[in-house]
Amino acid sequence: MWRLPAPTDRPRRIERLVAELVGDDEAHAFWNAFRDRFITEQDVAELAREGFNSLRVPLNARHIADPDGWALNEEAMARVDRLIEWCRGHGIYVILDLHAAPGGQTGTNIDDSERDQPELFENEIHGAATVRLWRNVAKRYRDEWIVAGYDLLNEPLPDWFARYNDRVLPLYRRITEAIRSVDRRHAIILEGVHWATDWSIFTERIDDNLVLEFHKYWNNPDRESLDPYLRMRDAWEVPIFMGEGGENNTDWYAGAFRLYDDLGISWNFWTWKKMDTANSPLSIRAPEGWSRVAEAAGHGSPLPRD
């Protein structure tokens, strides 16, 4: 997304890079400014003009709650509140997506994990924190009608961590029970394992208000590839949702999104904006000197602060 090399491929490492470059105080000011400007009401208005009716909001547990999940970070949640207010004003439903759970649910850069391990499924400390975090989020938004549902975990467990697959549904059940203790209203959205493509973990319905989510990138957008999801939709009588798709060309988009519409599958595009791209709705121009930052990130070489 930010055209940075692998050593600096996740939020915590990018944050360290910025702090090393400008110092802790200026880094704090930078991130406050970034979070205020990266997504604004203008973005939400543009989403509505383009015909979208939902926004999937990725949340990082490290940013929105204390490490144990007991308390939410009010400064961070105020930004979520503000985004929800904008969405309400423009008729855009909000899906709250725990993209980076305590400990990491994927064990790769996308979950902001520290050691490239899905520690959420290795250490009960993180499981308990995740349950508490979701209960607090649900309690905060239980009366917010523009929130469509809670996407409990983004893309848990790629295939090389399949040994933990049998731990996903029990954790989903625990989170759902915690949410339902404070919120009976909102949908519970469950993703399969292996980049949200494998639904074999769904052996029982754990709630009466479920949505099952899959992600689709790169491979052919054809009916055959969607049949497993359609069969489960019909068998369980639940909505299904293509929660992430993109990173392709316009021909792929046209075929995929038309097919989803024809089959009654709701979908979201990933991602709304990124740097120097031709395959997202919005592209960010790289700022002057960004190539030097990327080079320093890749080689660990210091940069002068000017």
Regions found by a protein language model. Give the residues of each.
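Active-site mouth of glycoside hydrolases
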Residues: 1-187, 192-200
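Non-catalytic C-terminal accessory domains or segments of carbohydrate-active enzymes
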Residues: 290-306
